[in-house]
């Protein structure tokens, strides 16, 4: 009887240690994933500032991308980037 109780207590202790280690590993992975997402967002923000994409608001200081042109479109009250009907050469 004592051996069975000792085995159960030992098994519970092993499960507790393993689950604690798994939670610590999961938290580290979560933090690493969050940092990676923030890095990707920062990289995409710098790319978005280089030129305005399709239907983006444009002015002299905010140019459209190469395949777009800045046009006034009614009923929108500001200029937007629209396709200039050209295809990029490869």
Swiss-Prot record:
GO terms for cellular component: extracellular region. One of its GO terms (molecular function) is toxin activity. InterPro entries: Huwentoxin-1. Disulfide bonds join 51-65, 58-70, 64-81. Expressed by the venom gland. Residues 20-50 form a propeptide. Keywords: Disulfide bond, Ion channel impairing toxin, Knottin, Secreted, Signal, Toxin. It is found in: Secreted. Residues 1-19 form the signal peptide. It comes from the Eukaryota. The presence of a 'disulfide through disulfide knot' structurally defines this protein as a knottin. Belongs to the neurotoxin 10 (Hwtx-1) family. 13 (Hntx-13) subfamily. Ion channel inhibitor. This is U7-theraphotoxin-Hhn1a 4.
